[in-house]
């Protein structure tokens, strides 16, 4: 019987709704991953409601919790680390120490960094020190980096004028160390207004994926967290880059279709769970010239 992969997911959590680990853990489990959730913040709900309660995990608790896992002899069984929303740069540095420790215990372990830098207009606030940490430190350690367009622009200190520019910008990040860059949401001049586009760039390959853009009165939160978790999970169960990319695009769209059909603001993960594991749809990733 094949071994079930184990993944340490270090990101935010909400008690109500779906963002951070609350958006990613259950879908990753439905893919067949044993997920170890470690919550960098625990809030009552996501911040786009405009009000919330909760607290940030003290940075020293991150290595302390990992010490506990090591103490029972399980650290070497960790196959991957996923990091997302950070409450502070100190948390980020603690995570990089954990990644180094896990890679020492299991040299084949992967690290995917979802570099959440915030979007004040949408109510997502991230301290400037966190953005600096992601730009200057985390990108050099990550095996996979999964920015959205705003985060890609920040990494490259420029904005694209075309899809070709987006490819060039993502490719420039490979020089910092990652194996591949997944741009979870593209936005550039000339992009079709009725499509949602994603980009995956590796050393000698690039793929572009388009799917229909679904309309919502208020855009659901947690879609990027869901995408990052699904992409890493599919790599862990044996997909190559292109198949993991296509699966991610399809499964996320299935969740959004269910969410739209229900008229929900929060992602309908439970109702869509079978379609997450086995998407009915497929969106072909088009190979791009490098």
UniProtKB/Swiss-Prot annotation:
<dbReference type="GO" id="GO:0005524">
    <property type="term" value="F:ATP binding"/>
</dbReference>
<dbReference type="GO" id="GO:0000287">
    <property type="term" value="F:magnesium ion binding"/>
</dbReference>
<keyword id="KW-0418">Kinase</keyword>
<comment type="subunit">
    <text>Homodimer.</text>
</comment>
<keyword id="KW-0547">Nucleotide-binding</keyword>
<comment type="similarity">
    <text>Belongs to the pyridoxine kinase family. PdxY subfamily.</text>
</comment>
<feature type="binding site">
    <location>
        <position position="12"/>
    </location>
    <ligand>
        <name>substrate</name>
    </ligand>
</feature>
<keyword id="KW-0067">ATP-binding</keyword>
<feature type="binding site">
    <location>
        <begin position="47"/>
        <end position="48"/>
    </location>
    <ligand>
        <name>substrate</name>
    </ligand>
</feature>
<dbReference type="InterPro" id="IPR023685">
    <property type="entry name" value="Pyridoxal_kinase_PdxY"/>
</dbReference>
<keyword id="KW-0460">Magnesium</keyword>
<dbReference type="GO" id="GO:0005829">
    <property type="term" value="C:cytosol"/>
</dbReference>
<feature type="binding site">
    <location>
        <position position="225"/>
    </location>
    <ligand>
        <name>substrate</name>
    </ligand>
</feature>
<protein>
    <recommendedName>
        <fullName>Pyridoxal kinase PdxY</fullName>
        <ecNumber>2.7.1.35</ecNumber>
    </recommendedName>
</protein>
<feature type="binding site">
    <location>
        <position position="114"/>
    </location>
    <ligand>
        <name>ATP</name>
    </ligand>
</feature>
<dbReference type="GO" id="GO:0008478">
    <property type="term" value="F:pyridoxal kinase activity"/>
</dbReference>
<dbReference type="InterPro" id="IPR013749">
    <property type="entry name" value="PM/HMP-P_kinase-1"/>
</dbReference>
<dbReference type="Pfam" id="PF08543">
    <property type="entry name" value="Phos_pyr_kin"/>
</dbReference>
<comment type="function">
    <text>Pyridoxal kinase involved in the salvage pathway of pyridoxal 5'-phosphate (PLP). Catalyzes the phosphorylation of pyridoxal to PLP.</text>
</comment>
<comment type="pathway">
    <text>Cofactor metabolism; pyridoxal 5'-phosphate salvage; pyridoxal 5'-phosphate from pyridoxal: step 1/1.</text>
</comment>
<feature type="binding site">
    <location>
        <position position="151"/>
    </location>
    <ligand>
        <name>ATP</name>
    </ligand>
</feature>
<dbReference type="GO" id="GO:0009443">
    <property type="term" value="P:pyridoxal 5'-phosphate salvage"/>
</dbReference>
<dbReference type="InterPro" id="IPR004625">
    <property type="entry name" value="PyrdxlKinase"/>
</dbReference>
<feature type="binding site">
    <location>
        <begin position="211"/>
        <end position="214"/>
    </location>
    <ligand>
        <name>ATP</name>
    </ligand>
</feature>
<dbReference type="InterPro" id="IPR029056">
    <property type="entry name" value="Ribokinase-like"/>
</dbReference>
<keyword id="KW-0808">Transferase</keyword>
<feature type="binding site">
    <location>
        <position position="184"/>
    </location>
    <ligand>
        <name>ATP</name>
    </ligand>
</feature>
């Amino acid at each position: 019987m094949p071994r079930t992969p184990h993944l340490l997911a270090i990101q935010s959590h909400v008690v109500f709704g779906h963002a951070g680990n609350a958006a990613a853990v259950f879908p990753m489990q439905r893919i067949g991953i044993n997920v170890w959730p470690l919550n960098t913040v625990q809030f009552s709900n996501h911040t786009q409601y405009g009000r919330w309660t909760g607290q940030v995990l003290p940075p020293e608790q991150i290595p302390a919790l990992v010490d506990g896992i090591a103490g029972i002899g399980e650290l070497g069984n960790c196959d991957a680390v996923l990091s997302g929303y950070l409450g502070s740069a100190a948390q980020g540095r603690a995570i990089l120490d954990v990644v180094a420790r896990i890679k020492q215990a299991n040299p084949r372990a992967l690290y995917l960094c979802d570099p959440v830098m915030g979007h004040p207009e949408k109510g997502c606030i991230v301290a400037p020190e966190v953005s600096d940490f992601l730009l200057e430190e985390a990108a050099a350690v990550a095996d996979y980096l999964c920015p959205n367009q705003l985060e890609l622009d920040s990494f490259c200190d420029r904005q694209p004028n075309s899809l070709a520019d987006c490819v060039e910008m993502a490719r420039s990040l490979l020089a910092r160390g990652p194996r591949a860059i997944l741009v979870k949401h593209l936005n550039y001049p000339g992009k079709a207004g009725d499509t949602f586009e994603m980009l995956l760039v590796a050393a000698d390959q690039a793929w572009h994926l388009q799917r229909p853009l679904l309309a919502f009165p208020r855009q659901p939160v947690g879609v990027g967290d869901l995408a990052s978790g699904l992409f890493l999970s599919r790599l862990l169960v044996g997909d190559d880059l292109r198949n993991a990319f296509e699966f991610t695009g399809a499964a996320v769209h299935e969740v959004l279709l269910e969410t739209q059909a229900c008229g929900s603001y929060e992602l309908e993960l439970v109702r869509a769970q079978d379609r997450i594991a086995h998407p009915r749809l497929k969106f072909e990733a088009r190979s791009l010239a490098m």
